[in-house]
Structure formats: structure tokens, C-alpha cells
């Protein structure tokens, strides 16, 4: 279950990033991470912590529900 959620979050993160015209490298720098680390967020390998979820939702103009694939 945890792995499935990480994959959903990663896919939605990638879609939102691309919709904003941003690169993995750009967002990685904003998070003080390497691009390879950021790539693992989008691949669902590394889970995001609370602060990164909040930052990325605000930065990408999405809600946590959007990120987690939850329909209202």
C-alpha cells in the first residue's frame, strides 16, 4: 500500500512540475537536493516529508489532495 501511494504521489508530482514548465533540477535546487534525489521522489522511491509536501504544493499550485490523487 505504501509503495502504491508513493508511486501515485510521484506521478502527480511529475505532472504538476511539467505543467509549470519546471525541470527536476530547478525544483531540486529549491529543496536543497540533488536532481537524482528529486528524481527518486517522482519515481516513488523516496517518500516526501511534510515540509516538502507543503512547499511543493504551494510552488506547483496544487493541493495535497491533488498530489495524493484524492477526489473531493
What are these regions (language model features)?
Residues 1-8:
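A detector for short, charged/polar N-terminal pre-domain segments
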Residues 4, 15, 43-44:
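Residue-level marker of alpha-helix boundaries and capping positions
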Residues 11-30, 55:
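Short basic helix-loop element that most often maps to the first helix and adjoining turn
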Residues 13, 27-28, 38-41, 67:
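Conserved hydrophobic/aromatic packing and binding residues within compact polymer-binding modules
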Residues 32, 51-66:
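DNA major-groove recognition helix of helix-turn-helix/homeodomain DNA-binding modules
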Residues 32-47:
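Recognition helix of helix-turn-helix/homeodomain-like DNA-binding domains
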Residues 70:
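Conserved short acidic donor-positioning loop in nucleotide-sugar-dependent glycosyltransferases
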